[in-house]
């Protein structure tokens, strides 16, 4: 009877592992054949303005003047861009988009496929037609600067630790780790989106 119970538990364990594997995202190693990709990203600065218009600007991106005044939200869908006049709006200096770092136009795309392409990036075939939006999360890039406010860190796996020579900030802290200042106030939790300070 004990053998049947062990066998049943073993089958449940194997089934659970199978379901985890099926649920996990695995991309094939085949290469895509994209001509280019578009990833709407923040561009320009008050001192180094971009050349665009509200018509040509990407949906989801906000456009600002050099003094920080909101001008407009872009109205062009990267999957089906607007046909717009070819001039620069002198009022627009920079944009703020959900994605901030990296190239806006990806060309060449290398071995990118729909599966390995980044979410929020749009990929186009050799004929210029929209193929797909990427499905993978883009790796987070963190600054290497130390946050001088951090005095202690509490991680679920290690407990409370005093920070001495360790260089840490809200971006590079392990997921779930809470960073505290000298007063014991929570600064942030690692692995969570941080608001711009």
Swiss-Prot record:
UniProt entry keywords in alphabetical sequence: Disulfide bond, Protease inhibitor, Repeat, Serine protease inhibitor, Signal
Site note Reactive bond for trypsin, residues: 29-30
Leader sequence residues: 1-24
Xref: Gene3D superfamilies: 3.30.60.30
Sequence repeat spans: 24-80, 81-140, 141-196
InterPro entries: Prot_inh_I20 (IPR003465), Protease_inhibitor_I20 (IPR051391)
MF term (GO), any: serine-type endopeptidase inhibitor activity
ATP-binding listed as a keyword: no
Induction: Locally induced in leaves subjected to different types of stress (TMV infection, wounding, UV irradiation).
Lipoprotein among keywords: no
Disulfide partners: 27-115, 31-111, 39-121, 51-88, 54-72, 55-84, 61-97, 114-132
Family: Belongs to the protease inhibitor I20 (potato type II proteinase inhibitor) family.
PANTHER family tied to this protein: PROTEINASE INHIBITOR TYPE-2 (PTHR33832:SF17), SERINE-TYPE ENDOPEPTIDASE INHIBITOR (PTHR33832)
Protein name per UniProt: Proteinase inhibitor type-2
């Amino acid at each position: 009877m004990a053998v049947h119970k062990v066998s049943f538990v073993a089958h449940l364990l194997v089934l659970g592992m199978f379901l985890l594997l099926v649920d996990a995202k695995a991309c094939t190693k085949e290469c895509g054949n994209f001509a280019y990709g578009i990833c709407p990203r923040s561009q320009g600065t008050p001192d180094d303005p971009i050349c665009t218009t509200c018509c040509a600007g990407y949906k989801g991106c906000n456009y600002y003047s050099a003094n920080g005044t909101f001008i407009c939200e872009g109205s062009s869908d990267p999957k089906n861009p607007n046909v717009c006049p070819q001039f620069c709006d002198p009022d627009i200096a920079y944009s703020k988009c959900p994605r901030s770092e990296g190239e806006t136009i990806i060309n060449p795309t290398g071995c990118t496929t729909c599966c390995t392409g980044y979410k929020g990036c749009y990929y186009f075939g050799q004929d210029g037609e929209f193929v797909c939006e990427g499905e993978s999360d883009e790796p987070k890039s963190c600054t290497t600067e130390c946050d001088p406010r951090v005095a202690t860190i509490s991680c679920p796996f290690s407990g409370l630790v005093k920070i001495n020579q360790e260089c840490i900030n809200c971006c590079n802290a392990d997921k779930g780790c809470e960073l505290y200042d000298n007063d014991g106030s929570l600064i942030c939790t690692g692995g969570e989106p941080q608001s711009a300070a």
